[in-house]
Amino acid sequence: MKHIPVLEDGPWKTVCVKELNGLKKLKRKGKEPVRRANGYKTFRLDLEAPELGATVSTTAATNGLRDRTQPFPIATPVPASVAPAVPPGGGTDTAREFRGIRAPEVSDARKRGFALGTVGPGLPTPPPPPASQSLAPGDPEAHSFREQALRPRILLCAPPARPTQSAPLAPPAAPQESPVRPAPPTRPGESSYSSISHVIYNNHPDSSASPRKRPGEATAASTEIKALQQTRRLLANARERTRVHTISAAFEALRKQVPCYSYGQKLSKLAILRIACNYILSLARLADLDYSADHSNLSFSECVQRCTRTLQAEGRAKKRKE
């Protein structure tokens, strides 16, 4: 077991100051430097002190936070009878008292949102009411005047409004109907993306009015169209088949009425028509009638020969085809 060194046995190891990058001396914060707002000095304000310096500092702080476009108001001179008498050596004590006692109140006001960066260029600050010369510093009316002077600080914490347009307003023109509905007015703290999305949504028509259909609807419609086309095609084929069968039956009935070599002989529709024409002319000649196109007044024997030549030519044509 190791021997535990005792204080008297040897010197203790010292800590090197260089390794710790030097000992830093803790400094207490002194008085804060005077801050400037828009080129004017701002001082801490005593909310309860009735001195004239409080009123002047309130006016300076309020005027410093105003819009730069507004002219700086001229300070109203206060007569000597109203201003309190300040001892020659009391100015320094009063300033120290302001720093020591009123610093928590000022820091609390900063925490509540009183900062120079929150003031927007488009948010004017109402000017404080002018100080009345007839009011004494210790009166309750003077205390209410100081409260009214502090109201602009509370108003400055409101959210910034929209930036105003620098161009002059044009005279009102005649109302014109626009296809796009106007966007609803947005609140000061609302993002501008809502108005943009509203305009984009209004520019595009509804999905129900669009000619495009959903994939399921398109498939169902195409199936119905194909079924309808197939039904129409089947009906047309049936009508054509019925027509051909009717014509074939009529020619077959006519063929049975004209002379031929045998009833089992196959004749074309054209041959049946020619034989039928010559047969009708032959019957007309028997009745002393002339049905010929050129009125050639053919004899009965000539009509019979035409029928015979037509039958022989049709028979030879059938044999060549076979």
UniProtKB/Swiss-Prot annotation:
It holds the Pfam family HLH. Keywords: Cytoplasm, Developmental protein, Differentiation, DNA-binding, Neurogenesis, Nucleus, Transcription, Transcription regulation. Signal peptide: none annotated. Residues 101-111 have a biased composition (Basic and acidic residues). GO terms for cellular component: cytoplasm; nuclear speck; nucleus. Expressed by subsets of mature neurons. Expressed in kidney (podocytes). Expression is restricted to the atria, lung mesenchyme, and vascular smooth muscle. The keyword DNA-binding applies. Residues 77-96, 101-144, 159-221 are annotated as: Disordered. Transcription factor that binds a palindromic (canonical) core consensus DNA sequence 5'-CANNTG- 3' known as an E-box element, possibly as a heterodimer with other bHLH proteins. Regulates endothelial cell proliferation, migration and tube-like structures formation. Modulates endothelial cell differentiation through NOS3. May be implicated in specification and differentiation of neuronal cell lineages in the brain. May participate in kidney development and may be involved in podocyte differentiation. The bHLH domain mediates transcriptional repression by inhibiting TCF3 transcriptional activity through heterodimerization. Efficient DNA binding requires dimerization with another bHLH protein. Interacts with NEUROG3 and NEUROD1. Interacts with ZFPM2; mediates indirect interaction with GATA4. Forms a heterodimer with TCF3; repress transcription of TCF3 and TCF3/NEUROG3 dimer-induced transactivation of E box-dependent promoters. This is Transcription factor Atoh8. It comes from Mus musculus.
